[in-house]
Swiss-Prot record:
Keyword annotations from UniProtKB, A to Z: Cytoplasm, Methyltransferase, rRNA processing, S-adenosyl-L-methionine, Transferase
CDD domains: RsmI
Encoding gene, per UniProt annotation: rsmI
The keyword Zinc belongs to this UniProt entry's keyword annotation: no
SUPFAM superfamilies named in the record: Tetrapyrrole methylase
Gene3D superfamilies registered for this protein in UniProt: Cobalt-precorrin-4 Transmethylase, Domain 1, Methyltransferase, Cobalt-precorrin-4 Transmethylase, Domain 2
UniProt EC number: 2.1.1.198
Protein name: Ribosomal RNA small subunit methyltransferase I
Function: Catalyzes the 2'-O-methylation of the ribose of cytidine 1402 (C1402) in 16S rRNA.
Pfam families membership: TP_methylase (PF00590)
Family: Belongs to the methyltransferase superfamily. RsmI family.
């Protein structure tokens, strides 16, 4: 049998493919980071009778052996993330890698991905981009100096609302003219983009008493945002 890699909505529960729903209905086992999150989706689509396997860092090694054993026993297993496409900034890649090494078929479904949604909605260059995952908590200055030394169209990273202002202020000292797009609460009721020069975006955030929601940060040194149309 095989491992199915199934993307799930990043906010709006309607953002799931018919094929993904059919896979979740057909398998007996679903590997997930947080069983509570996937249960909300399963309940929404009336999918019942599934065995949920907690698959999260740092317990993934134990579960990998269990999941591979299930597949060897002719069971299909679906891998899901808390939101979006599995293996993007989550431990899913380790399971996929292990299955490939064991010659177990891996079938990846296309679907929601916060970084791509944010990049497209940012209006910043898409011809080349670098995904940085979650913003680092240590050695930030040296990290960003190294990152911005590369010749890349856009840079994308995930950041928390509590740290976004500090991160932008640090980056502004390294690249004072960089263009920024903050994508907040993507696909949800309060979805918002804040776009502009990094200094202007910082000033906008300072006006707000409380920044909430999941954030994707897109940056570009090409300064193409809102230039006059040809």
């Amino acid at each position: 049998m095989k491992l199915y890699v199934v993307p799930t909505p990043i906010g709006n529960l309607e953002d799931i493919t018919i094929r993904a729903i059919n896979i979740l209905k057909s398998v007996k086992f679903i590997a997930c980071e947080d069983t509570r999150r996937i249960q909300i989706l399963l309940k929404h689509y009336n999918i019942e009778g599934k065995t949920l396997l907690s698959y999260y860092h740092p317990k993934e090694a134990i579960q990998i052996r269990k999941i591979i054993s299930l597949i060897r026993k002719d069971e299909d297993v679906a891998l899901v993330s808390d939101a979006g496409t599995p293996s993007i900034s989550d431990p899913g890649f380790k399971l996929i890698n292990a299955c490939i090494k064991e010659d177990i078929p891996v079938e990846v479904l296309p679907g929601p991905c916060a970084l791509i949604t944010a990049l497209v909605g940012s209006g910043l260059p898409t011809h080349s981009f670098m995904f940085l995952g979650f913003a680092p908590r240590k050695s930030q200055e040296s990290f960003y100096k190294e990152v911005f030394s590369s010749d890349t169209g856009s840079y994308i990273l995930y950041e928390s609302p509590q740290r976004i202002l500090d991160t932008l202020e640090l980056i502004s000292h390294i690249e004072p003219n960089i263009t920024v797009a903050i994508a907040r609460e993507l696909t949800k009721m309060h979805e918002e983009y804040i776009r502009g020069n990094i200094k202007d975006v910082i000033e906008e955030l300072k006006k707000r008493n409380n920044i909430k929601g999941e954030i994707v940060l897109v940056l570009s040194k090409e300064n193409t945002l809102y230039q006059e149309s040809l």
